């Protein structure tokens, strides 16, 4: 029996960015085996193949003044085709959108929901060989509980609430300062491990199939 294939499509935390140190210096990238998609692969073993597609700065939508390649939709059309056929897709986007002052919570939710609609349409085309596959699961966007990001709290809460009402959404387990790098956005090593464990649990319990 062939293992299932899961595409993980997201931003810098999917890519494995260490973020910035307390002095603002970029800390580069975690080793491959320390990045949560690859930790998840280790936990799942031969049952699934994980396809990691992360990009620093990626957004769910497109914004004026941003580099076109950072808009997630065009990249997703390519990534889904490259990974197909897939058993499912995990979308880990939204925080970069929330930091954009021009982006309303409503628009971000609509942009995130696009990924599910596009995947369903892609899976429905018999030429793509996905049969009844095409489930999309979202990781609820979250950031560290630090004061400098307090203005984003209401927007992120709105996004999470709306996604949960319409789509399978896996709770982000990172609720502690130690789960994040000093910049409060990127995951620490502990954070990468905790996210991988949460996604693994969701898959094994049937929340994500």
Q: Where in this protein do the model-derived segments appear?
A:
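Short, flexible/disordered intra-domain loops and linkers
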Residues: 20-30, 64-68, 146-154
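Acidic carboxylate-rich catalytic motifs and surrounding loops in phosphoryl-/glycosyl-chemistry enzymes
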Residues: 52-58, 171-175
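Serine-esterase "nucleophile elbow" of acetyl-processing enzymes
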Residues: 1-54
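Gly/Ser/Thr-rich helix-start
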Residues: 11, 17, 55-58, 93-95, ...
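Alpha-helical cap/lid subdomain in secreted, periplasmic
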Residues: 2, 34, 38, 46, ...
């Amino acid at each position: 029996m062939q293992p299932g294939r899961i595409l993980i499509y997201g931003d810098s935390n999917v890519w494995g960015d260490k973020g910035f140190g307390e002095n603002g210096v970029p800390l580069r990238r975690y080793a491959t085996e320390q990045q949560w998609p690859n930790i998840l692969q280790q936990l799942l073993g031969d049952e699934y193949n994980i396809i990691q597609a992360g990009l620093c700065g990626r957004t769910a939508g497109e914004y004026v003044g941003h580099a076109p390649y950072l808009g997630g939709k065009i990249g997703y059309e390519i990534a889904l085709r490259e990974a197909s056929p897939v058993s499912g897709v995990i979308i880990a986007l939204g925080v970069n959108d929330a930091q954009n002052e021009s982006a309303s919570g409503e628009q971000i939710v609509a942009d995130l929901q696009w990924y599910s609609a596009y995947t369903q349409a892609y899976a429905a085309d018999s030429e793509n060989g996905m049969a009844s596959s095409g489930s999309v699961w979202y990781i609820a966007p979250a950031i560290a509980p630090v004061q400098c990001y307090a203005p984003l709290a209401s927007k992120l809460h709105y996004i999470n609430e709306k996604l949960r009402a319409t789509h399978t959404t896996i709770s982000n387990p990172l609720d502690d300062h130690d789960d994040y790098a000093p910049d409060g956005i990127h995951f620490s090593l502990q954070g990468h491990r905790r996210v991988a464990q949460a996604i693994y649990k969701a898959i094994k319990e049937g929340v994500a199939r």
